[in-house]
């Protein structure tokens, strides 16, 4: 036997021996990992936050950062407040439809003086911004854990303050007055501007203890609670179990037009909530009741008349009938048109 051939045979034998020897070690290591991983994969899915998602999904996280969803709600800071509250020495006044509002800053806080629940004018501190563009609203804390949306919003394109109900005088005590239930964040708006929101309404006390896992519309608002997926992803690729949808509760790919449109519909439709929204992949009508083509909401031909968002009119369109889905025109992470 020639010396080169002998060397190759020896090398092959040594390599085979190393592979065979390493197999038990790999199996043993995986066996030690499995109990914890199995528990995480079988436990009820819980929300883990975008930082956990970003470890593997850097591209999607970068696209999402700075989007309308990312800025759907935030603490009132100089980076997030887009409205003109003056500069500490200058005040800004809005007046119209029987309402007056004075916007100003003091001690680093954003303040507004306007009509209160009793009809008297008082100062209120802005706690949160609400929305990013084309308008931004502002939330004020009230007793009972309530957050109320001011009636004057900032037009980010025209750069001006405007009244949300032009031509109407909404008196104190009216359901639509900004201090009443029609403009209550907890019950009317919160569900679609934060992730894993729990209203926490206590009927006997008529008070809220509202919580969220992330203040804005983050990854799990659309993908569902991600603990099982994160546990699955942390297993070495060759040892990952065959888990449906990689452990995610909500399927977002490989689904039909109706399923994908219904994924967006809870927050892009005028609808009523039938109960807690569990982000569990259930059909839309199991958790929400979309508004029908009621008079005053739509034009006779089905076009949008009032604030009905997108779902109701899109459902009537030729595009929907032909299988067009939201993500055919909109990037789901940047929320921009493609």
Feature locations, PLM:
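N-terminal Sec-pathway targeting helices
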Residues: 3-15
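Hydrophobic membrane-insertion alpha-helices, especially the h-region
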Residues: 12-26
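Primarily the internal scaffold of c-type cytochrome electron-transfer domains
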Residues: 30-37, 44, 51, 59-131, ...
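Long, basic N-terminal domains or extensions that often function
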Residues: 188-193
């Amino acid at each position: 036997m020639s010396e080169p051939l002998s060397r190759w045979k020896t090398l092959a034998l040594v390599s085979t021996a190393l592979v065979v020897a390493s197999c038990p070690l790999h199996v043993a290591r995986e066996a030690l990992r499995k109990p914890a991983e199995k528990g995480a994969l079988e436990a009820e899915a819980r929300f883990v936050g975008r930082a956990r998602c970003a470890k593997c999904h850097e591209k999607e996280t970068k696209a999402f950062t700075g989007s309308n969803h990312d800025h759907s709600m935030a603490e009132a800071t100089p980076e997030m407040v887009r409205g003109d509250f003056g500069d500490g020495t200058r005040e800004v006044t809005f007046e119209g439809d029987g309402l007056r509002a004075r916007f100003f800053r003091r001690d680093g806080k954003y303040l507004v003086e306007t009509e209160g629940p009793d009809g008297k004018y008082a100062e209120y501190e802005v706690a949160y911004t609400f929305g990013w563009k084309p308008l931004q609203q502002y939330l004020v804390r009230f007793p009972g854990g309530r957050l109320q949306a001011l009636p004057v919003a900032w037009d980010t394109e025209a750069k001006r303050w405007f009244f949300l109900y032009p031509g109407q005088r909404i008196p104190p005590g009216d359901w639509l007055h900004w201090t009443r239930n029609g403009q209550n964040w907890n019950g009317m708006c919160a569900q679609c501007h934060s992730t894993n929101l729990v209203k926490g309404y206590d009927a006997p006390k008529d008070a809220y203890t509202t919580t969220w896992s992330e203040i804005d519309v983050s990854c799990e608002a659309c993908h569902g609670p991600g603990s099982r997926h994160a546990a699955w992803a942390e297993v070495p690729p060759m040892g990952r179990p065959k888990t449906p949808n990689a452990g995610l509760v909500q399927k977002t790919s490989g689904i039909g037009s109706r399923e994908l449109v219904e994924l967006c519909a809870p927050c892009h439709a005028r609808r009523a909530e039938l109960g807690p929204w569990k982000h569990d992949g259930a059909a839309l009508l199991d958790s929400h009741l979309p508004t029908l083509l009621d008079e005053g909401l739509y034009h006779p031909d089905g076009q949008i008349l009032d604030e009905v968002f997108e779902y109701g009119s899109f459902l009537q369109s030729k595009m929907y009938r032909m299988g067009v889905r939201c993500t055919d025109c909109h990037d789901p992470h940047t929320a921009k048109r493609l």
